[in-house]
């Protein structure tokens, strides 16, 4: 009954546009530059209480509402970040795609629709998908290849927690791999997963993918990532997810201190990942 009630609330929240975004900065480790952010959807009820994303996102997927959630995310990214992205062509915002977004191809159409006339360039909107989105491998490969041809970079998110990671990675048209926080947490511990982290990094580099470490919280983790030559990271060591205005301030201060992203980040497609049978 409680889940049914929450489902009804979510439908109302989507209709009333109560969902909003926070932005977690993504940092280039060699330079300290803020190259962009990951857009993270949030839901605050009218009474001020927050509903956790790990509750309402799976519910939206189960109830067939995830497409509407993704539409709102895309619309809000364009609205929130238009001024920043037009002013700083080296910056990008990453949006998360659900399995339905990939199988339907709707997210790509909605992104193109909302970007039209905004001044935002396709390479400034990155698309991220978890391994759960690749159940239909052929469809996923087609949609992600279309996204890359349109100018978007594509990343696999939360890598390492899926059921067939290695098999899928070689078959998908990707630009970047984001290592799941659980593997970053294992750095320097006796965890059974700790030997997996360097293997993931090496595998990504062999395939020519950028590596983004998620959930970085300690200086020890950061030092390890430097030694492994991981390019990018995000996590509370750098910043919590921020409301739009706070992220703009964060990005501006970081830019004043470290500068803008290097030329290769301004056009990710300048480093294409071409593999036989993929594109």
Each language-model region and where it sits:
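Short alpha-helix boundary/capping motifs
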Residues: 38, 84, 88, 101, ...
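C-terminal helical cap(s) of enzyme catalytic domains, especially alpha/beta-barrels
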Residues: 10, 226, 242-269, 274
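The catalytic core of metal-dependent phosphodiesterases that act on cyclic dinucleotides
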Residues: 93, 112-187, 191, 199-243
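Bacterial c-di-GMP phosphodiesterase EAL domain
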Residues: 2-120, 132, 146, 166, ...
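Conserved acetyl-CoA-binding loop-helix of GNAT-fold acetyltransferases
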Residues: 69-72, 193-199
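Amphipathic, coiled-coil-like alpha-helical segments
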Residues: 128, 147, 272-279
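Residues that scaffold the ATP/ADP-binding catalytic core of kinase and kinase-like folds
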Residues: 59, 105, 137, 186-187, ...
